[in-house]
Amino acid sequence: MTHLNFETRMPLGTAVIDQFLGLRPHPTKIQATYVWIDGTGENLRSKTRTFDKLPKRIEDYPIWNYDGSSTGQAKGRDSDRYLRPVAAYPDPFLGGGNKLVMCDTLDHQMQPTATSHRQACAEIMHEIRDTRPWFGMEQEYLIVDRDEHPLGWPKHGFPDPQGKYYCSVGADRAFGREVVETHYRACLHAGLNIFGTNAEVTPGQWEFQIGTCEGIDMGDQLWMSRYILHRVAEQFGVCVSLDPKPKVTMGDWNGAGCHTNFSTAEMRAPGGIAAIEAAMTGLKRTHLEAMKVYDPHGGEDNLRRLTGRHETSSADKFSWGVANRGCSIRIPRQVAAERKGYLEDRRPSSNCDPYQVTAMIAQSILF
């Protein structure tokens, strides 16, 4: 990759934008930023429009269009694609009544594009709504500079071996906390169910958790939290990698996942451990199918991560156990002790599509 000049900045850019973002909000008009998943199935795009007044319901946000030939979702001769708003959140960057709007992407026949999996997920969640499906997803990521070098790593050589970085404190081991704390506050402002955050095992790697969310809300909130994370990183002049195992970490370093916690009302009730253990049958049956949708490249990304080392299971073999982070599915020790609660699917990669992951878990256990 071409090395960029990190000193190339717009003069006084931050001071100027702060001046205008600090202006009093317009008394009636608002800005709505439409956010969508592009043709990669993992990257996000956005564009903003003005409304004369704040829409009261998600249905009041109109369908919009965009150039799908520039996002890997259409050919130039038939490039128009549609954005269908599905969820709106307070905008932590613009404040006031401004909104971030998560959108589905639709083709010229108003059908979901190839990388738009929300509609299929929503149909499944509607079918199982009486089970009260709860999800929580643990998003791991790596903060990198613009030539994809992890924050805190020496330019030549490697940092000290992992061991001192997890949940760490100190300038010699916790790299990028400014991004992490800003993202946390921004998610809270946006009304997302952000549960917490922590430094992870690999230096420069962090995690945040979104949940508890019920049904389709899980996918909407995780995608929007990712968008906010990328925007925050942009303001600090760094980038976020959701690659589950970047080349620089291919040695003795933990990869990045998106462990997904799941429960039903039955699992959360007294004696729910029986339902949790019964779920393993369905999860085992669909293991190979699940591996194909747990990253956006048909399972290829996870092959680099799920090696049976670094707190992972083997990609080609299903396993489960209590408190075992080397299994496909972990039952937390506290859950086993209380005999109710939830299970943790440790297979999804950090760049997974949460719509596909939550739909697969629901199908595996409840269909």
Curated annotation (Swiss-Prot):
Q: Which domain of life is it from?
A: Eukaryota
User: What catalytic reaction does the record list?
Assistant: L-glutamate + NH4(+) + ATP = L-glutamine + ADP + phosphate + H(+)
Its recorded name reads Probable glutamine synthetase
Keyword Nucleotide-binding part of the UniProt annotation: yes
Q: How does it assemble?
A: Homooctamer.
Annotated keywords: ATP-binding, Cytoplasm, Ligase, Nucleotide-binding
Look up and give the organism this protein is from.
Caenorhabditis elegans
**E.C. numbers:** 6.3.1.2
* Record-annotated GS catalytic domain positions: 117-367
